C-alpha cells in the first residue's frame, strides 16, 4: 500500500506537469486547455481508500463475488487477482494480472503460479518470447565498474525507482563485501531520485516475511541487504548538482521520472 501511494502521487505530479506544459504550448496556438488525467489531490483521495490484503487469503467483495491476491514476484507487493463470480449454481473464475516476475530475482519471492481459470486477462508485452538465461549480474556489474573506474569514469545506471534501484543496491553491497572491484573499494554510490529514496525506505521497513529466503537469511544475521557502504542520497536539485563536483569514480543510480 505504501509503495502504491508514493507511485500514484508521483504519477499524478507528472500528469499535472505535462498538462501545464501542453497548456503553455497550446495557448500560443489558440488550442483548448487540457486537464491532467488525475491530480495529486485525486491521488491523495484515492490513497485514503486503500486497504491492504494478505496474499493467499480469499475475501468476499459482495454476495457471490470472492477474490484472492496472489504474489507474482514482479515488484514488492505486486499481485495477480483471482476472482470467483457465482450466479445461481454456476461459479466462474477470472484472473487479472499485470507483469509476472522472473525466477530468482533478488529480494522478492518467486511468482506463485495459478493453476486454473476460466478466463484470464493479463499484460502481455513479452508474451511471445522466452527469457534468456539469467546472467551473473554481480560478476558482470563488477567488471563494468572495474573497467570504468580504472579509466577515471563514472557508472551511471538508469533504474526504475521501485524494484530496479533496490536490486542494484543489493548487487553493489555484495560487490563491496566480496571486494570484487580492486583499487576502488570505497567508491561512493549515489541514489539520485527522491522517489527511489522513499521506495528504498519502504523496502527497509517491510515485514521480512515478504522477502525471499536469501534476503531473510541476511536479515537474520543483522545484514541490511540494500545498505551499501558509501551510499549517498540525493533528494534536492542542489544534491544532484553536487554529484558533478565529486571527481571520485562513482556509481550513480537515477530515474528521470522524479
Question: Each predicted region: which residue ranges?
Answer:
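A short acidic, often aromatic-flanked loop/helix-cap motif at beta-alpha or helix-coil junctions
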Residues: 2, 57-60, 196-198, 240-242
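Conserved small/polar residues in nucleotide/adenosyl-binding loops
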Residues: 255-258
Amino acid at each position: 500500500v505504501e509503495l502504491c501511494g508514493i507511485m500514484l502521487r508521483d504519477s499524478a505530479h507528472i500528469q499535472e506537469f505535462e498538462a501545464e506544459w501542453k497548456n503553455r504550448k497550446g495557448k500560443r496556438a489558440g488550442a483548448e486547455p487540457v486537464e491532467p488525467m488525475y491530480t495529486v489531490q485525486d491521488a491523495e483521495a484515492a490513497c485514503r481508500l486503500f486497504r491492504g490484503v494478505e496474499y493467499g487469503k480469499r475475501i468476499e467483495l459482495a454476495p457471490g463475488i470472492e477474490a484472492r491476491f496472489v504474489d507474482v514476484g514482479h515488484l514488492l507487493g505486486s499481485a495477480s487477482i483471482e476472482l470467483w463470480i457465482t450466479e445461481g449454481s454456476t461459479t466462474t473464475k477470472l484472473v487479472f494480472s499485470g507483469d509476472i516476475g522472473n525466477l530468482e530475482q533478488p529480494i522478492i519471492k518467486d511468482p506463485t503460479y495459478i493453476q486454473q481459470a476460466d478466463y484470464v486477462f493479463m499484460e502481455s508485452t513479452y508474451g511471445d518470447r522466452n527469457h534468456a538465461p539469467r546472467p551473473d549480474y554481480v560478476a558482470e556489474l563488477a567488471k563494468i565498474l572495474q573497467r570504468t573506474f580504472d579509466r577515471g569514469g563514472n557508472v551511471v545506471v538508469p533504474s526504475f525507482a521501485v524494484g530496479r534501484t533496490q536490486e542494484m543496491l543489493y548487487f553493489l553491497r555484495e560487490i563491496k563485501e566480496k571486494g570484487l572491484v580492486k583499487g576502488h573499494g570505497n567508491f561512493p554510490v549515489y541514489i539520485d531520485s527522491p522517489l527511489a529514496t522513499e521506495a528504498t525506505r519502504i523496502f527497509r521497513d517491510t515485514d521480512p516475511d515478504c522477502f525471499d529466503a536469501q534476503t531473510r537469511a541476511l536479515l537474520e544475521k543483522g545484514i541490511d541487504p540494500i545498505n551499501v557502504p558509501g551510499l549517498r542520497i540525493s533528494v534536492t536539485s542542489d544534491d544532484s548538482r553536487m554529484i558533478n563536483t565529486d571527481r571520485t569514480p562513482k556509481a550513480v543510480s537515477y530515474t528521470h521520472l522524479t
